């Protein structure tokens, strides 16, 4: 979905006072242009679909969008690229050493898929959390990361869960209870637990991707409750937040929304507070 009127407001002259956020998805790029003011007003946002040609590589489809939409190459003050990590762990920021992030993602972890020694198709990144005492150390697709860095001059790479997480951290600062944040995208489930603005648990799971929303909701419930019990959370006090990307970005959110509706019904007897919220994915 593209709002042509909002795109007409974009120009190379105004770009230095704006930021561009993009999120790579299987079908294209979600984007958002914001002002640099404290309110970060949205100037334009939407979804740019890739070419339907199955023969083209991801790099070719990505560059084709840049040739088609001039505004992607404007000289923005800052550019943020959101990516989905293959795996990630929480690490105290003071213990993260540049160039040695991969040591934290050893193959003994349940959620880390083994890779051949010396595999150059992946890279390791670290990003401080908003509360700054911990960092996400991630393993990502090197092809995509290098593509971002070659194409965009001033780029900051950020894990895809950060927009929703930042929103919930700010929201939860006034609560004493813990909150388990649930993010579902395709076959990837992300579970983040936080309390009073501080993240204390993270888990990423690859789902079987059931054919119907009911089965999908039940599979999410299985992993959600396993994490809930592992963390010792209390259904009468602690909360669950189910994140749904805003429809403006034209991502396939209907299936996830229906799965969440079923999940919320299943959780009702056990968790007193379950909230479904929308967020901008970039």
Where are these regions (language model features)?
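N-terminal basic/disordered segments at the start of proteins
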Residues: 1-39
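Residue-level marker for the onset of beta-strands and adjacent loop->beta junctions
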Residues: 16-18, 77, 178
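Short glycine-rich phosphate-binding loop at a beta-alpha junction
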Residues: 21, 71-87, 235-252
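Small-residue (GG/TT-enriched) beta-loop-alpha framework at ligand/catalytic clefts
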Residues: 23-29, 123-236
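Short acidic, S/G/P-rich loop/turn micro-motifs used as interaction or catalytic elements
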Residues: 29, 49-53, 87-90, 246-251
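A cross-kingdom feature marking solvent-exposed beta-strand/loop segments within repeated
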Residues: 44-57, 203-205, 213
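Active-site neighborhood for divalent-cation/phosphate handling
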Residues: 45-51, 60-170
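Accessory, usually C-terminal, subdomains that scaffold auxiliary metal cofactors
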Residues: 200-281
């Amino acid at each position: 979905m593209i709002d042509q009127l909002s795109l007409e407001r974009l120009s190379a002259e105004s770009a230095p006072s704006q930021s561009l956020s993009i999120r790579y998805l299987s079908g294209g790029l979600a984007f958002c242009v914001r002002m640099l003011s404290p309110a970060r007003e949205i100037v334009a946002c939407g979804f740019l679909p890739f070419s339907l040609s199955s023969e083209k590589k991801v790099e070719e489809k990505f560059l084709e969008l840049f040739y088609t939409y001039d505004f992607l190459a404007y000289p923005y003050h800052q550019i943020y690229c959101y990516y989905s990590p293959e795996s990630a762990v929480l690490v105290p920021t003071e213990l993260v050493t540049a160039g040695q992030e991969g040591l934290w993602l050893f193959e003994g972890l349940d959620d880390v898929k083994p890779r051949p020694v010396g595999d150059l198709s992946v890279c390791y990144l670290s990003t401080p959390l908003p509360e700054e005492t911990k960092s996400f150390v991630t393993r990502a697709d090197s092809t995509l990361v290098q593509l971002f860095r070659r194409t965009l001059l001033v780029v900051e790479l950020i894990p895809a869960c950060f927009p929703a997480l930042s929103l919930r951290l700010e929201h939860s600062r006034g609560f004493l209870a813990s909150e388990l944040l649930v993010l579902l995208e395709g076959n990837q489930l992300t579970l983040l637990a936080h309390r009073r603005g501080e993240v204390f648990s993270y888990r990423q799971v690859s789902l079987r991707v059931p054919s119907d929303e009911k089965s999908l909701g039940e599979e999410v419930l299985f992993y959600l409750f396993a994490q809930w019990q592992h963390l010792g959370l209390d259904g009468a006090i602690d909360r669950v937040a189910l994140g749904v990307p805003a429809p403006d970005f034209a991502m396939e959110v209907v299936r996830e929304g229906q799965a969440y509706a079923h999940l919320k019904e299943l959780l009702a007897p056990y968790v007193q507070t379950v909230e479904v919220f929308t967020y901008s994915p970039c």
